[in-house]
Structures are given as structure tokens and as C-alpha cells.
A protein has these predicted regions:
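Short, surface-exposed acidic
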Residues: 40, 95, 298-305
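Short secondary-structure boundary segments
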Residues: 67, 237, 242, 304, ...
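ATP-dependent adenylation/nucleotidyltransferase module used to activate substrates
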Residues: 121-296
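Conserved short alpha-helical segments that host acidic/polar catalytic motifs at enzyme active sites
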Residues: 1-121
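Short, amphipathic alpha-helical segments that act as regulatory/interfacial helices
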Residues: 29, 227, 262, 321-324
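Local cysteine-cluster metal-coordination motifs and their immediate loop/turn environment
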Residues: 224, 302-325
Length: 342
């Protein structure tokens, strides 16, 4: 319609003036001011619904999307568009591929200039916190950065759950942060993790170098729950304690995992909402995390890392081994572990 190609649904076209129109897209030429990239962004703010649009201007063209996908392929002086990458891929030469427009973005197709569409954002951060060294440090990092921090702890039946619950209460009080508890039922899984059964827990370096205690899809499940809670309770940021050291043995601690999950979030929450994942210690090893937390005054004496339950850290399992070693490398005393016994 008048130089505008639209894929999606305009839910408020009648309110915008398309009272008797059968096709919602017919209202767009009246709504879209194509004078500049900024006026495009201002115009689409009036629309309630979904859209991936290509808009012809006087001497250029614009593309703008919310969550509807749009792929671009430049070939022989022509720009091809599609909502699916596979429609354009056969046209690509070796080494080429269609380029996706980032969700909630407008672009001037001649100059390449882009704008991000405004979304609902705030400084509320939901830290997925086990009460261990890494995620507790993350909570204090975000507080230092000015976030309004709340702690989300999952009850999934691990052996150290009673100790973790106590730890979370103390950390929340020290941080002056709300602590939210959510239960996840793993009891129906057969052949499950040693953390959930009476299976063997590896000790020392063996426990630190391989994911013997892997809980099936734990971080994926927890992130799905955290995303739902964040959206429902108006949190823009979800923070994780994923780090470089544990990425070596846990696939869901790899940076690529959080990068890919972050891409899903634009399609997992309501239109106009933003929920993002941050990993403030994602590029750090354990000893670097301890050094950072020490500077910030993190109360490591309150934290719990041990896979085994009990009144004290066992000093044997992989997490005990890793944290004790991390403190040693900083010439610091680990306030939670007297000594290693491996």
C-alpha cells in the first residue's frame, strides 16, 4: 500500500482511522511518517500489533520490525526481503548468507543507519542465586552498578537444599534484597543426578574438571522459570553466575548458551517488553571472581558451595575444591572451608 510492504497484524487499525477497511495494512500510509529514520520510529510507536515492514521513502527505503522476523539479502544492486532465511538462502553465493534485522530495530537501507525501538525497561535485576560463590558475587556486582537487586533461588531437591535456603536468607538480609523461592520438581526423572539421589559425588580435581553431577537441563529449566517471573514482575535484567571456569565442564555455563538463550527472549516475552540476560563474571576464573568479591566486600562466610549437605562444607567435592583453591591463589583464607581433605 503506497510503498509500504507489511507482514503482521495491526490490532488498532480502526482506532487509527481504518474504520471500514477490511485490510488492516491499509492504514499504514496514513500513520507512517517516512521523512527520516526518527519519524519512522515515532510512527510505529502508534501501532499496536506485529510488524515487519519495508517502507519506501523519497530517496531511500526503511525497514522496521518489532518481533516479526525480516531477512535481507543484497545481490547485484537489489535488496531481497523475506520473513524466513531459507527463502533467500538458495540465492546466496558461497560464503554469503541473508542478514536478519535485529528485533525492535529500524534501519535506513541506503545509509545503514539504525535505531532501536523503545521498550519497557528499568533497573530491576533478578539474580538467579544458589547462595554460592559465583552468583552471590554477581548480586553484589549489580548492586555496585546501581541495580535494584532481588534474588531468585530454586528449590529443586538437591542434597544441600536446607543449607542453601539458610544461606539465601542470610545473604538477602546482608544485601537488603528480597529473596524469592521457586520450586522445580525433578522427582519424576529416572536415572537423575547424584545431587538429587544417593549417587556418587566426585571429589577433588575430578569433581572440578567434569560434570559428574550434571542435573538434566537445569539451567535451561531455571532460565525459563526466571524469564516468566521477570516478565510477570517487571524485571528487565536476569543475572547469572556463569563463569569461564565452569564453562569448561558444564555446557550450560558456556557463554554461547546464554548468547543463544538471549536471542530467544525477544520472542518469549510480550511485545514491547524487554528481558535480557547478563553474566557479569562470565569472563572470569574462580580466583578472579574471589578477587572481585573481596574488593566489593562480599560476605563469603555466608555462602554455601558444597554439593553435600551437613553442618559444614565437606572440603572434598568439586565446588569445595574450586573455591578453596581460588582463595589460595589470592592468598586469602576461605571463611567457609577450614581445609581440603582430598
Amino acid at each position: 500500500y503506497d510503498g509500504i510492504i507489511h507482514n503482521g497484524i495491526i490490532a488498532n487499525d480502526a482506532e487509527l482511522g481504518n474504520v471500514n477497511g477490511l485490510v488492516d495494512s491499509m492504514i499504514l500510509p496514513q500513520v507512517i511518517d517516512r521523512s527520516s529514520l526518527d519519524t519512522i520510529v515515532d510512527s510505529v510507536a502508534k501501532i499496536r500489533g506485529s510488524y515487519a515492514m519495508v517502507i519506501r521513502g523519497d530517496d531511500t527505503a526503511f525497514a522496521v520490525v518489532n518481533y516479526k522476523p525480516l531477512y535481507l539479502l543484497r545481490k547485484d544492486g537489489t535488496i531481497y526481503f523475506s520473513s524466513m532465511e531459507r527463502h533467500l538462502s538458495p540465492e546466496c553465493l558461497f560464503g554469503e548468507r541473508p542478514v536478519p534485522l535485529e528485533p525492535y530495530t529500524a534501519v535506513d537501507l541506503r545509509s545503514g543507519e539504525t535505531r532501536s525501538l523503545p521498550r519497557q525497561e528499568n533497573n530491576k535485576a533478578l539474580v538467579v542465586c544458589s547462595g554460592g560463590l559465583d552468583s552471590t558475587t554477581v548480586a553484589y556486582v549489580l548492586r555496585e552498578q546501581g541495580y535494584d537487586v532481588s534474588l531468585l533461588h530454586f528449590l529443586y531437591g538437591c542434597k544441600a537444599e536446607p543449607q542453601e535456603v539458610t544461606t539465601m536468607r542470610h545473604i538477602g538480609k546482608h544485601l537488603n534484597a528480597e529473596v524469592i523461592y521457586q520450586a522445580i520438581d525433578y522427582t519424576s526423572l529416572s536415572g537423575s543426578s547424584p545431587l538429587l539421589t544417593n549417587g556418587h559425588i566426585a571429589d577433588g580435581a575430578a569433581g572440578a574438571e567434569f560434570a559428574s553431577e550434571w542435573v538434566p537441563a537445569r539451567n535451561l529449566v531455571m532460565l525459563a522459570h526466571a524469564t516468566a517471573y521477570a516478565e510477570a514482575n517487571n524485571f528487565t535484567t536476569i543475572a547469572l553466575g556463569n563463569n569461564l571456569e565452569e564453562g569448561g565442564c558444564y555446557p550450560d555455563n558456556e557463554e554461547e548458551f546464554t548468547t543463544l538463550f538471549s536471542k530467544v527472549l525477544d520472542y518469549a516475552v510480550a511485545d514491547g517488553r524487554r528481558v535480557r540476560i547478563v553474566t557479569p563474571v562470565g569472563n572470569l576464573m574462580k580466583h578472579e571472581i574471589v578477587a572481585l568479591g573481596h574488593r566489593l566486600g562480599v560476605p563469603y562466610e555466608l555462602t554455601w558451595s558444597c554439593y553435600r549437605g551437613g553442618e559444614e562444607h565437606c572440603g572434598k567435592c568439586g565446588p569445595c575444591f574450586m573455591r578453596y583453591t581460588a582463595f589460595q591463589r589470592n592468598n586469602l583464607h576461605d571463611p567457609a572451608i577450614r581445609e581440603l581433605v582430598v
